Amino acid sequence: MMKQRISIFLLFTILLSANGYAQKAIMRLTQQTLMHEVRETPSPLDGQHITVNPPRFMWPDKFPHLGAVLDGVEEEDYKPEVTYRIRIARDPEFKSEVITAERKWAFFNPFKLFEKGKWYWQYAYVDKDGKEEWSPVSHFYIDEHIRTFNPPSQQEVLAKLPKTHPRILLDAKDWDNIIERNKNNPEAQAYIRKADKCLNHPLKHLEEEIDTTQVVKLTNIVQYRSALIRESRKIVDREEANIEAMVRAYLLTKNEVYYKEGIKRLSEILSWKNSKYFAGDFNRSTILSMSTSAYDAWYNLLTPDEKKLLLRTIRENGKKFYHEYVNHLENRIADNHVWQMTFRILNMAAFATYGELPMASTWVDYCYNEWVSRLPGLNTDGGWHNGDSYFQVNLRTLIEVPAFYSRISGFDFFADPWYNNNAFYVIYQQPPFSKSAGQGNSHESKLKPNGTRVGYADALARECNNPWAAAYVRTILQKEPDIMEKTFLGKSGDLTWYRCITKKALPKEGPTLAELPMAKVFNETGIGTMNTSLGDTDKNAMLSFRSSSYGSTSHALANQNAFNTFYGGKAIFYSSGHRTGFTDDHCMYSYRNTRAHNSILVNGMTQKIGTEGYGWIPRWYEAVSYTHLTLPTTERV
């Protein structure tokens, strides 16, 4: 008991000692922001020493585009088509051995390793008359011991893409083997049971299902549209689960009854697009996702009219998403819904219809190159700046997209170091049976790791052969063996299908969580946790903190220099408020606001909401008996 008290005391003294230490080596930043909502500087920067070979090249849009504020509140702003050119060489005059490219978006992947030394690069905007507007010449360095990560080019990937269907949810050549492997798999049988229930429950029209009793009372147009979309999504998401179950039931059995009922049900859903209750990019992406799954899985059974219907739906919705993304997504600090789901959905639609829908080739080009350029994480430390709850909305994308690329190309996309770093984020931000560390919107709802988080850790363990992720999974499954079943068919995070088709096994039992360091800081993301007993949640005292260069943009909160404390997996000194929306008074003044968190109000002033209200973690130290960190003074309004 005495050791526990000492440990808890040490955790609390970290914050008390931080200011005194900071006086010895003061750091001052004067920039208004460390991050741009929309890119304002090129990458690589002039004089930069590159961290990965080959480098990824990105530059500001000629016509910067912020996009809609909220889902369903779209704006018809001007975003013209553009053309860019780029050149890269060893000499600043670009006279010999020049790498050149022309792109319709503001990024370029060379897909070739660069020799060590100094390189020069430059980009240009090309107007409609062909006139080039070149940027200043920048230089960068490729150092001797640089890390390499060089995925295959788009052309190499497409050369290996199967021309048969199905090819998205599974590869046709492995189909019979997958059926055989899953005959006695309880998770596979869950799809069949779900599909069988749908056979006996006819579908009603959207207007008969949606509950608008509360929506009609709202007078604010933003709140009205937001509430209407939430209610319609409940119905659309429910039906998405039904269609996806019937698609997978067919793939697991080849029983055509699931196709016949499924296409009938899907045809009704597709008629909802003209309803006044149907709006928002999540609903549109759901339509695109269902149509893609049905087209690819039932391709050999579809009638000509059914194929036309699905291809038309894919074309109409895919075109809208592509137009929204191009010259927007690549230069945004983050785009919530796109990273969470809609990018994955457009990517799968593109590869499913490549060679059969002319514009799919452009979608493939954009999506694949965008993933290589910026994803999976928006930095390298494995953290998630949007917080733990919204991290979990990205889980299917983080696994299914690279798993698909790896399957068709033979290249291991999970070899990106971000994934092994992210395994530590999963563990430290929410240890087994513990409440979330408390960052980002809806953090308060994450009382303990749920099935999607455990399923994601399971996939990381398999794909990366990561012993720590495997230990996390085994620790939780010992007490909750059915935890992954509880999130079956979850829209954004369920990885049941991944487990049904993968041949990769969970690593053999190895080290335990007790062998991990007690503290972990993700300094690029600006978060960290300290623990006393990671291997035993009941006895673990934990402190979490945040001071982030991302500020409070997106789903992040205005909680720079804030901390939370926990014991036995339960919150002791914790943030207040509840996620009630994105724009309501409680959210803005008593949830996202600094006063809802364990930080300091300087002269009663709260932190700015946006990238301007930033912090950072200048340094931290960890030893056997203590951990020490230094936090900055926070930007205020």
Report each predicted region and the residues it spans.
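Low-complexity, Pro/Ser/Thr- and charge-rich linker/hinge segments at domain boundaries
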Residues: 141-169
